[in-house]
Amino acid sequence: MRQAGRAALLAALLLLVQLCPGSSQRSPEAAGVQDPSLRWSPGARNQGGGARALLLLLAERFPRRAGPGRLGLGTAGERPRRDNPSLSIDLTFHLLRTLLELARTQSQRERAEQNRIIFDSVGK
């Protein structure tokens, strides 16, 4: 039973590594782990420390968010500046423009239909 649990854990870990982009790069947060028993090494898999290796790999894939003390910022409300605008803002404005265009087109169609009804009733 214990071997089956390890096999399932290993399969889940391999799937996680395949799904995460940049799997060959190590994060600086994970490289800064101070506890030598948690450091990953190629021989760590064979030492029975599978749980430790898994935790370290998860720490590499999903680093903790750096608090204000780690980045050296003065207040907790400050955020580091991003060079590139976020994709969500671009997507939001794109969707907003598209919806406005659709609403404008629908409004023009309704107005044209109302004008056609008026001209038909007047007899022009």
Curated annotation (Swiss-Prot):
Where do the record's region annotations for Disordered lie?
A: 23-46
Propeptide residue interval(s):
26-82
Name the organs or tissues of expression. Keratinocytes in epidermis and the outer and inner root sheaths of hair follicles, epithelium of sebaceous and sweat glands, erector pili muscle, cutaneous blood vessel walls, cutaneous nerves and dermal mononuclear cells. Detected in plasma cells in the lamia propria in colon mucosa (at protein level). Expressed in pituitary and adrenal glands. Detected in plasma cells in the lamia propria in colon mucosa.
Cysteines engaged in disulfide bonds, as pairs: none
For the modification Valine amide, which residues carry it?
V122
Name the source's superkingdom: Eukaryota
Effect on the protein of changing I118A: Reduced affinity for CRHR2
Q: What is the effect of changing F119A?
A: Strongly reduced affinity for CRHR2
What family is it from?
Answer: Belongs to the sauvagine/corticotropin-releasing factor/urotensin I family.
Q: What else is known?
A: Positive correlation between increased expression in colonic lamina propria and severity of inflammation in patients with ulcerative colitis.
What name does the UniProt record give this protein?
Urocortin
Give the gene name: UCN
